[in-house]
Amino acid sequence: MRLQVALAFALLSLNAHADSRATAFVSAYSDDDNLTVVSPEVALRQELSPAVDVEASWEADIISAASVDVMTAASPRGFEETRHGLTAGVTWKPEPEVTFGLKYLPTWENDYSSHGLSLRTGYEWLERRLEQRLDLRASFDRVGRAGEPESEWRDLELVAVGPSVSWVIDRWTVASVAYELQAQSGFQASPYRFVPIDWSSGTTVSAPERHPEWRVRHALALGVRHALSRRWFASGGYRFYRDSWKLSSHTADAGLQYATRQERAIVGVDVRGYYQGEASFYQERYTAAPGTLPSYRSRDKMLSENWSVLAGLRGEVGLGPVAFTDDVRVAARTEIYDQHFLSFEPLGGRRAFIFQLGATAEY
């Protein structure tokens, strides 16, 4: 199935002074739970006219795993797989203050396929100090087991709506608030995981993982960015999440950044803390009467109570014009990520190291 790894990093948002740009970067994630993910990506954005831009990108996740999830499921030797993803999009600005964007996002691997669509609208008010956006997303996925006929794969559908507002409070401060409502319907368990059930008779049986087929998610995020001086910038944010599986989480983050004159070089440090409770049907150990099974059962550690911390350093350097380009910028980031599971018997925690290196050429 598709392995959704929360790689807690992103390439620096490089300043865009040109209308077209090409980007390439590679990310590497490795933890002490024997999971390694290498993720290359290339992207191109091209201006067709003053009002229309097009973009295209390719990305991949090259995964090698022998983690606890794998070793306790039906793949005792671990696995290696590659996920591919494409993006094709167009942005239209009929007026300087108005933006419409449309993207198509297909992804595929040997046991998962997805076709996604996203639509974004944006409008700037009050001399462009207030920006409101509305994001609409939908995806149509198919989930199966490697080697299984696709006719036996199961469906998973998603729709989401996300309004957001950002406000330039003064020349030093920008604040934002965003909300997302998401609904998923279909197969949401792992076709590989099996859950041990302790019968009261003393026998332990193993049953396929089974999750509810309906899930509604809510997320509210607040953020602020403040210029402490012409060189120093601070940022902070908070996100609250709650869903119909009674799982809730809290995320807080903060960052500090220094920029040289004309932002030719930028360095920064970021920290993030996360805590979540467990889903209503999740149990570390399940018990049942002989011959019966719990209606819903899970061996997914990401549905258990857990907390994590992340800290990272990042840097960005502008090289100026190179060959036919107007500017080339190189960015790097390194992070350490600690996660601790409070109610997952096979694994108490894991530590990961994350590195990313990339470049953007503007032309």
Question: Which residue stretches match the model-derived regions?
Answer:
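Outer membrane beta-barrel transmembrane domains
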Residues: 67-78, 182, 188-223, 242-253, ...
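Residue-level signature of outer-membrane beta-barrel architecture
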Residues: 46-48, 92, 123-125, 167, ...
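Short loop/turn motifs that connect adjacent beta-strands in outer-membrane beta-barrel proteins
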Residues: 16-19, 51, 96-97, 126-130, ...
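Transmembrane beta-strands of outer-membrane beta-barrel pores
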Residues: 26-32, 60-64, 106-110, 125-127, ...
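Transmembrane beta-strands of outer-membrane beta-barrel proteins
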Residues: 20-24, 54-56, 100-102, 130-134, ...
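Membrane-embedded beta-strands of outer-membrane beta-barrel proteins
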Residues: 24, 42, 86-88, 119, ...
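Short glycine/proline- and aromatic-enriched beta-strand/turn motifs that initiate or cap beta-hairpins
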Residues: 17-55, 337, 349
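Outer-membrane beta-barrel "beta-signal"
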Residues: 121, 172, 313-315, 351-363
